[in-house]
Amino acid sequence: MKIEGTVVAMVTPFTEDDVVDEAGLRENINYLIENGVDGLLVAGTTGESATITHEEQRRMIDILVDEVNGRVRTVAGAGSNSSREAMGLVEYAEDAGADAALVITPYYNKPQPHGLIEHYTMLEEAADIPLIIYNVPSRTGTDIDVDTVAELAKLDGIIGIKEASPDLDKVSMLRSRLMDLGLDDFTVLSGNDNLTLPMISMGAEGVISVVANVDPARMSRLVNEALSGDFESAMKTHYELYSLMKVLFIESNPVPVKEALNMMGKARGSCEDAPGTPAGCKP
């Protein structure tokens, strides 16, 4: 199983009554597929995984798998700072038929490397669904190091990492270590739209993208150009998207991307339980 190319970190649309807009979610799924993306993720950071209920999370996984119907890869957000909760979500994603589960490093508790290895090993042993590690130290307070990732990459069920730290040298160190271990099949995905081009040049194989919610065709083009080795064209596409990459993060994600989708007439709704965040998020 490979998860690569442009995977969209989808927003969670809500109705005016602050319930998940299931019809809107299906509309967004089809819009993104029609514009050439390679995969879709629900209930990630952009999907407000930290504030939606587990019931909402499970329902979105069901809708994703049903609506996609094999057309692109499906990735279920299934992380938690509780190993038991994460296990339940991973098992649910497997039963629902998702292609992979994205599992964030446990947040707030700030586990040491041995704790991270224990956490992910337990999840890998609990279910047969491929797992993708999600490293986003700016949100979790934990930055999983290269040695720990390399150790986890030896497990058959852990197939890749979404790397959302800004440290580009870390990508080189990780790729070098994986090559030394003969683990070339382990996938590295960019977790930052603006760093996707340089990360692919260092051996990453795609991106889990926020920007692709708004401009899926052009973000897919950037990734495809870079993966094919056409870095001159990819650089031009990168700079065509650069202003969008920056403006979508002028407020806490997903506030700007939801407002952009609102301006486009796409389903977005308010943000769930996001105090102090304007531009369409409820207080």
UniProtKB/Swiss-Prot annotation:
Gene Ontology BP terms: diaminopimelate biosynthetic process; lysine biosynthetic process via diaminopimelate
Pathway it works in: Amino-acid biosynthesis; L-lysine biosynthesis via DAP pathway; (S)-tetrahydrodipicolinate from L-aspartate: step 3/4
Annotated Gene Ontology cellular component terms: cytoplasm
Enzyme's top EC category: lyase
Entry annotated with the keyword Thylakoid: no
Binding site for pyruvate: T46, I208
EC number(s) per entry: 4.3.3.7
Keyword list, A-Z: Amino-acid biosynthesis, Cytoplasm, Diaminopimelate biosynthesis, Lyase, Lysine biosynthesis, Schiff base
Annotated site, Part of a proton relay during catalysis, chain positions: T45, Y108
Cellular localisation: Cytoplasm
Catalytic machinery residues: Y134, K162
Matches recorded under InterPro entries: Aldolase_TIM (IPR013785), DapA (IPR005263), DapA-like (IPR002220), Schiff_base-form_aldolases_AS (IPR020625), Schiff_base-form_aldolases_CS (IPR020624)
Catalyzed reaction equations: L-aspartate 4-semialdehyde + pyruvate = (2S,4S)-4-hydroxy-2,3,4,5-tetrahydrodipicolinate + H2O + H(+)
Domain of life: Archaea
Single GO term (MF): 4-hydroxy-tetrahydrodipicolinate synthase activity
TM helices/strands, residue ranges: none
Family: Belongs to the DapA family.
Subunit details: Homotetramer; dimer of dimers.
Function as written in the Swiss-Prot or TrEMBL entry: Catalyzes the condensation of (S)-aspartate-beta-semialdehyde [(S)-ASA] and pyruvate to 4-hydroxy-tetrahydrodipicolinate (HTPA).
NCBIfam families assigned: dapA (TIGR00674)
The protein's name in its UniProt record: 4-hydroxy-tetrahydrodipicolinate synthase
